[in-house]
């Protein structure tokens, strides 16, 4: 199954620790979505943006671990997008923004570097959450 990561799980080291059997398939951009921070990474629909993501091939065991990591279903909801081909998590509470911790931000920043994703939206999302 396929999973799209846009936050901490863009980082290869972080993903390997929780889902060692996950296989990275590369960095991509999801149209009509933008990155936001609500303390943790989230996304929202916006036709003026594209969301940098990393696609992973994951196992059933990995999906269970991701559910724990994302505090599903309390903090994050899990849905399938793009004709139900990809799993992606988004926050249940879509209200407001909040800056991420420096460590969390650096972890995502490294993930963007790992997959040569454009860091502009990452910086904008952090600035807007401040």
Predicted regions mapped to residue ranges:
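Glycine-aromatic micro-motifs
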Residues: 1-130
């Amino acid at each position: 199954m396929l999973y799209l990561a846009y936050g901490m799980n863009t980082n290869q080291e972080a993903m390997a620790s929780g889902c060692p059997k996950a296989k990275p398939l590369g960095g991509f951009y999801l149209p009509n979505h933008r990155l936001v921070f609500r303390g943790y990474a989230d996304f929202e629909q916006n036709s003026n943006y594209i969301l940098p993501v990393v696609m992973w091939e994951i196992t059933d065991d990995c999906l269970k671990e991701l559910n724990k990591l994302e505090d599903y279903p309390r903090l994050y909801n899990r849905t399938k997008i793009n004709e139900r081909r990809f799993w992606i998590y988004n926050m249940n509470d879509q209200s407001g923004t909040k800056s991420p911790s420096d460590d969390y931000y650096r972890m995502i920043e490294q993930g963007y570097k790992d997959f040569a994703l454009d860091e502009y939206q990452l910086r904008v999302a952090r600035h807007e959450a401040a």
